[in-house]
């Protein structure tokens, strides 16, 4: 079985932008396209919650890694809920970068507690975002891929106690 990264030249990364303006989405897309990744892009113009769930394509769900860019400027409370939702939806394979034009230390701390891996200032500086992507690429490249189904659990239930099913 061949590794999909070797066959296609790079790992499959889902790039999700949440409530970001067009200029930010364009900047993020252009910089991420320079990485050696196969990008699966999704742009959402609303925050996520339990009541308002997004639709992710199957390719985005099956991607080896996910990168979410969440803009905190419009509604920080809903942005925090979105970060928590993404963290639980893509458990252990997502990196979340928060963006805000206001450098509020309390907001940065709350976003990190909710699941953000990094927090950058708006307007997005290409050099800072490239450094973040390079760190993530190094991290994701060092993780050894495991098969999805590594084992099987078989359990037996006896009809009544004392029949030797242990």
Describe each region flagged by the PLM.
Residues 9-32, 49, 69:
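Conserved acidic segment of CheY-like receiver
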Residues 52-56, 60, 64-86:
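Conserved phosphotransfer microenvironments
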Residues 93-103:
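A short, hydrophobic beta-strand element within the central beta-sheet of small alpha/beta folds
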Residues 109-113:
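Alpha4-beta5-alpha5 "output face"
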Residues 124-132:
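C-terminal output helix
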Residues 135-146:
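The C-terminal output helix
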Residues 145-166:
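Walker A (P-loop) phosphate-binding motif
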């Amino acid at each position: 079985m061949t590794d999909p990264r070797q066959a296609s030249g790079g790992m499959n990364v889902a790039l999700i932008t949440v409530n970001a303006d067009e200029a930010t989405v364009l900047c993020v897309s252009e910089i991420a396209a320079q990485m050696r990744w196969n990008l699966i892009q999704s742009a959402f113009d609303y925050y996520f919650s339990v009541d308002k769930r997004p639709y992710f394509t199957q390719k985005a769900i099956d991607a080896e890694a996910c990168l979410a860019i969440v803009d905190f400027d419009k509604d920080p409370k809903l942005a925090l809920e979105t970060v928590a939702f993404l963290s639980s939806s893509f458990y252990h394979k997502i990196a979340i970068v928060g963006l805000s034009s206001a450098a509020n230390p309390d907001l940065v701390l709350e976003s990190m507690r909710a699941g953000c891996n990094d927090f950058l200032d708006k307007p997005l500086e290409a050099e800072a975002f490239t450094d973040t992507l390079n760190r993530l690429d190094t991290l994701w490249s060092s993780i050894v891929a495991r098969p999805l189904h590594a084992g099987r659990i078989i359990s037996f239930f006896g009809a009544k106690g004392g029949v030797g099913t242990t």
